[in-house]
Amino acid sequence: MMRSLATAFAFGTVLPVPAGGRGPMGRGAMTALPVVGLALGALAAAVAWGGAVVFGRSSPLGGLLAVAALLLITRGLHIDGVADTADGLGCYGPPDRARAVMRDGSTGPFGVAAVVVVVMAQALAFSALAAGRPVPVGVAVAVFAGRVAAVLACRRTVPAAAGSSLGATVAGSQPATVAAAWVAVLLGMSLVAGPRPWHGPVAVLLGLGCGGVLVRHCVRRFGGISGDVLGAAIELTATVSAVALAALVRV
């Protein structure tokens, strides 16, 4: 278990993990990925809270700095998946052509637009959540939800896209019990994410639902999931969860 956790941190962050303490990315590391999400969520919440203290609760700078911190500590790994997946979905060719577009090193207009929307939506939502609560638990819950979405995307019935090395190692690797357990933990944490107990669960379920729709569409479009699809699902789920929660706390 510790080896899988170390592998998950080595994969999902820039934190130095000794080579001897980690293994290849696979089933165990994917199961442990939400733990990485908890750590990243705590970091983002702390930065957003600090930004609200320094710049004022009405300033969006705290949320923007929180997103920047996440991009730095994850090497932009998942946001790159957003760009590649958007470009692939924007291609009107057959699945093999769409997969080739995703593997291309350049970023097209769909990818650029998707990244801008995700970054700005997360930044503004994080700022709103930090302004509305003494401790922005909602920020941490949204980031955590994104990593839970990755586990759901790798459940037993989901295939890997042809030519995807990461997809081949993690697609279909997660039993339903593991996915259900992480969803239960997420829902439990989300109970304290908003002023009312139902705010958090509604927001994260909406986020997970949107992430699930994206994964299903990508399976139809690309023939399965890849590392880029997982990254896009993570970011979409986190974004929708944060935006929905920011809207609900004002109800």
UniProtKB/Swiss-Prot annotation:
EC numbers for this chain: 2.7.8.26
Transmembrane domains' residue ranges: 35-55, 59-79, 110-130, 134-154, 175-195, 199-219, 229-249
GO biological process terms, semicolon-separated: cobalamin biosynthetic process
Pathway: Cofactor biosynthesis; adenosylcobalamin biosynthesis; adenosylcobalamin from cob(II)yrinate a,c-diamide: step 7/7
Reactions catalysed: alpha-ribazole + adenosylcob(III)inamide-GDP = adenosylcob(III)alamin + GMP + H(+); alpha-ribazole 5'-phosphate + adenosylcob(III)inamide-GDP = adenosylcob(III)alamin 5'-phosphate + GMP + H(+)
Entry's localization field: Cell membrane
Main location: membrane
The protein's required cofactors: Mg(2+)
GO cellular component, one term: plasma membrane
Coiled coil start-end: none
Source species, domain of life: Bacteria
Summary of the function given for this chain in its UniProt record: Joins adenosylcobinamide-GDP and alpha-ribazole to generate adenosylcobalamin (Ado-cobalamin). Also synthesizes adenosylcobalamin 5'-phosphate from adenosylcobinamide-GDP and alpha-ribazole 5'-phosphate.
Protein name according to UniProt: Adenosylcobinamide-GDP ribazoletransferase
Native organism: Mycolicibacterium paratuberculosis (strain ATCC BAA-968 / K-10) (Mycobacterium paratuberculosis)
